[in-house]
Amino acid sequence: MGIALENVNFTYQEGTPLASAALSDVSLTIEDGSYTALIGHTGSGKSTILQLLNGLLVPSQGSVRVFDTLITSTSKNKDIRQIRKQVGLVFQFAENQIFEETVLKDVAFGPQNFGVSEEDAVKTAREKLALVGIDESLFDRSPFELSGGQMRRVAIAGILAMEPAILVLDEPTAGLDPLGRKELMTLFKKLHQSGMTIVLVTHLMDDVAEYANQVYVMEKGRLVKGGKPSDVFQDVVFMEEVQLGVPKITAFCKRLADRGVSFKRLPIKIEEFKESLNG
């Protein structure tokens, strides 16, 4: 098992008049090697969970287990530091994570911060920059001279340079054009195929259907549904009630089903729809 949340509650500014409950009795597991999507409206608790996974927050009650490390409200910084090496968190606007004077230095910073020699850190940085599609001619440039899409790739390379076992992504393609979005999602797919555990927060149900093998639905700080995307998206009415919807092809097939067309199961991918026509 990669990650397990057990009866987790979290309250921002706990013990003050401004206390705000963000999570209530959340229990879920993220298996090692899985591609898990976390979906829900703004304010549902998704981003709070991501920060718990990375140790940026600790639970008010309950526990978060990442491999062999258990995090509770009383955990020490040394335990949390270990989690941050295992779980790489890419924020929604990952370019905000950039701060060094050159692209190469920025990506090499993380490994060096965890005790890797400068020589090895630079070697790893070069490898990860190549992996995310940043040309070597840009390595000595200021990252702030790059395009928004390039800056995001540099930030992702910086996380990958720390060799995390789990990559946590908070709306990683927000604001990108369709080509840039497709290229990044393809990169994450390849990382997953290489054995990395992926946790994705997204509002795009088509991406959930295409890439994830597990999905959790959050609403108002509670976990309200979970399972395989092919199962969760069968409940079209529920997904519309929580204002998330379903993949475009699923919505189309639901309209056909309402008009008498028979499906054994509603397709969640175009390929499944084509197969249903041939079957």
Curated annotation (Swiss-Prot):
Membrane topology: Peripheral membrane protein
GO CC terms, sorted: ATP-binding cassette (ABC) transporter complex
PROSITE patterns: ABC_TRANSPORTER_1 (PS00211), ABC_TRANSPORTER_2 (PS50893), CBIO (PS51246)
Disulfide bridge map: none
Keyword Transport: yes
Domain ABC transporter span(s) in chain numbering: 3-245
Keywords: ATP-binding, Cell membrane, Membrane, Nucleotide-binding, Translocase, Transport
Binding site for ATP: G40, H41, T42, G43, S44, G45, K46, S47
E.C. number(s) listed in UniProt: 7.-.-.-
Keyword Transport listed: yes
Compartments where located: Cell membrane
Top-level taxon: Bacteria
Entry's family note: Belongs to the ABC transporter superfamily. Energy-coupling factor EcfA family.
Subunit architecture: Forms a stable energy-coupling factor (ECF) transporter complex composed of 2 membrane-embedded substrate-binding proteins (S component), 2 ATP-binding proteins (A component) and 2 transmembrane proteins (T component).
Reported function: ATP-binding (A) component of a common energy-coupling factor (ECF) ABC-transporter complex. Unlike classic ABC transporters this ECF transporter provides the energy necessary to transport a number of different substrates.
Name of the protein: Energy-coupling factor transporter ATP-binding protein EcfA2
